[in-house]
Amino acid sequence: MRPPSPLPARWLCVLAGALAWALGPAGGQAARLQEECDYVQMIEVQHKQCLEEAQLENETIGCSKMWDNLTCWPATPRGQVVVLACPLIFKLFSSIQGRNVSRSCTDEGWTHLEPGPYPIACGLDDKAASLDEQQTMFYGSVKTGYTIGYGLSLATLLVATAILSLFRKLHCTRNYIHMHLFISFILRAAAVFIKDLALFDSGESDQCSEGSVGCKAAMVFFQYCVMANFFWLLVEGLYLYTLLAVSFFSERKYFWGYILIGWGVPSTFTMVWTIARIHFEDYGCWDTINSSLWWIIKGPILTSILVNFILFICIIRILLQKLRPPDIRKSDSSPYSRLARSTLLLIPLFGVHYIMFAFFPDNFKPEVKMVFELVVGSFQGFVVAILYCFLNGEVQAELRRKWRRWHLQGVLGWNPKYRHPSGGSNGATCSTQVSMLTRVSPGARRSSSFQAEVSLV
C-alpha cells in the first residue's frame, strides 16, 4: 500500500514564513526568508535527483525509490526498515534537533511514516500547530472583514461619483477634488480584490519562485492605488487649508497642481520602486515588505500622513478661532459642539486615524494594527461617500429638485423649463451653501466653501 502524500514542501515553507513573520523581529525577516528559500531550493534539487535515480534503477524485489515531497526513500528489500533524519526544513519550526523518521517495506509496499506524520515526528509541537491554526483563522477573518468593507465602499463610492458627475449644479473645484478622492478609493478597493485574486486564488504567494508577470503587475497597480489614495487625502487637506490661509488664489491653477500631487507623485515613486524591484529583488510576487526598497513606497505615504495630520491640527485651530468671536458668551457651548462635529467630519476626509500606527515598528501589535488598518480602513471610503455626498445638503437639495421634476414629467406629462434660482451657472451651489457656521464666520467665498465641508449634515 502506497502511503498518502504528505503536505508539499512549498506549503511547509509558506507556513514557516508566516510563523517567522508573525513571531520574529522585523530585522530578521529578510534572513528568515532567504533561509526558507534556501531550503525550498535544496528540496527541489533533492526531488529532481531522486526522480532521476529512480529512473536509472533496475527493478528490484521490494519497494522502489520513492519521493514523498520532503524525503527521498531509497529502494529497499521487503521486510526491512529504513530510518532517515527529519528534513532540514523543520529547523525553522522546532528547536528540537536529531529526530528521525522511518518507513517499513512490506509486501504491500511502503508503510505510513513512523512515529507519525512529519509535524509530529519532527518536533512541531501542539502549541506551534495550535498557534498556526489560530493565525490561519485570524487571517481568514481579517480577509473576510476587509472584503466586506471594500465591497461596501466600492458600491457607495460608484454611486456617489456618478451623482457628482451627472448633476452640473454640483460641479465646482471642491466637488471635483471629492470626485478624484472617490475615484482613488474605488481604485484602491479594486486593487485589493485584484491583488487577492493574484496572490491567493492563483496560488502565487510563494516568495521563492520567480512569480508571473501578471502577479507582479497586480502588485504594482496595488501599490500605486494605495499611495494615490493617501495623496488625495493630502490634497483634501491642502485644499481646505488653502481656503482658510490664502486670501486670493486661482482655483483652476491650484487644481492642476492638486492633480499633479494626487496622481503624478504616486506614479513617480511607484515607477522607481518597480525598477528597483526588477534590478535588486525580482523574486516572488513582489509582496514582501522586509527590505530597504519598501521605504520607496512607505516613506511617501508616512510623509503624507504626517503632513495631513499637521494640516488637520492647523485647520481645527483656525476653525476654533472662527467659532469664538469676541461677543460670544463663555457659557455658550454651541461653538464647541459645532467644533466637535466639524472635527469628527474631517477625520475620515483627512485619514487622521492612520497616524495612530503610522510610525510604530512593523512588529508592534501586528494583529491590532492589521485589524485597524485593513478592516477598519476598508470602510473609510464608505464613510467618506456617506458624509460628503449622500448627507451633503447640496446633493440632497439637487436630488430632491430632480426627483420633483421627474415626478412631474411622469405624472402630469409636463416638461418644465426649469431654471435654478442661482442663475444656472455651474458651481453656484457649491459656493453659496448656508451652513451652521454662517452666523459667526465671514461671508467670503473661500470661507463659505470651507463651511460647506464642515457642515454637511
Curated annotation (Swiss-Prot):
Cell compartments where the protein resides: Cell membrane
UniProt xrefs under InterPro entries: GPCR_2, GPCR_2-like_7TM, GPCR_2_extracell_dom_sf, GPCR_2_extracellular_dom, GPCR_2_secretin-like, GPCR_2_secretin-like_CS, GPCR_2_VIP_rcpt, GPCR_2_VIP_rcpt_1
GO cellular component: plasma membrane; receptor complex
Tissue expr: In lung, HT-29 colonic epithelial cells, Raji B-lymphoblasts. Lesser extent in brain, heart, kidney, liver and placenta. Not expressed in CD4+ or CD8+ T-cells. Expressed in the T-cell lines HARRIS, HuT 78, Jurkat and SUP-T1, but not in the T-cell lines Peer, MOLT-4, HSB and YT.
Residues modified by glycosylation: N58, N69, N100, N290
Intervals, Cytoplasmic compartment: 167-174, 242-254, 317-338, 392-457
Membrane topology field: Multi-pass membrane protein
Protein name as catalogued: Vasoactive intestinal polypeptide receptor 1
Gene from which this protein is expressed: VIPR1
